[in-house]
Amino acid sequence: MDQIQKVAFQRVFKTPGVKNQVADIAKKASWTPLLSAADGTKVTCSPNLNAPETTPGEERTFGDGNEVVGGIPISLGSSPTEFAAVIRRQPQSVIAQLKKMMCEEVGVYIFDINGMIGCLADNPSNPTKYEPIPIFSMFVGDYSFGGYDGTGSNNISWKFKPNWSDNLVFVKPQDFNPLTDLVNPDSDSSSEI
């Protein structure tokens, strides 16, 4: 997957205990009802994401020297993966809508520069259902003035749990480009929420 350009947010659970899943994620017809939904299945597309950076979690360890056998640290797993980007030149009403998701249990479908969709699958080698990648500690920052040589912007960031990518798959859409064809209802463009 290449540069992330947009994401689609969706609640992880459509109802308590029942995960959101899409059977045929490669067809636009699967997305259309999700964009206009008024329940827990609703999908909301982000504006364009600039300067996206993903920092994979580093190993967490315990001990050294005489504290552990042979002085070899004990591996405890990994820390979360961090994602950060910048949203430029968007009305603050769009940003306010994104901020409402900061206290929701949401996930993301990732759209790259080539229109590929990144998401989780029930079985990565033979997927039958796809779901959003859960995110945590979502943050949407206040407006930053751009100055003479820049543009106004808002920072956005979140974390993925350790091992988040174990069931990650990349899907090529069959009849649409998610960057241009998935538009939030009542929007003049795909960059508005």
Please state what every model-predicted region is:
Residues 1-84, 133-150:
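Solvent-exposed edge beta-strands and adjacent loop segments
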Residues 3, 25, 40, 49-51, ...:
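Short linear motifs in intrinsically disordered/low-complexity regions
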Residues 7-10, 83-87, 104-115:
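Short, hydrophobic/proline-enriched secondary-structure or compact coil segments at domain edges
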Residues 69-95, 149-166:
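Oligomerization/assembly interface segments of phage tail-like spikes and tubes
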Residues 82-89, 115-142:
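Short acidic, glycine/tyrosine-flanked loop/strand segments centered on an H-E-D-like triad
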Residues 95-129:
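Short, acidic/charged, Gly/Pro-enriched secondary-structure junctions
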Residues 129-193:
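Mixed-charge, glycine-accented linear interaction segment located at domain edges/termini
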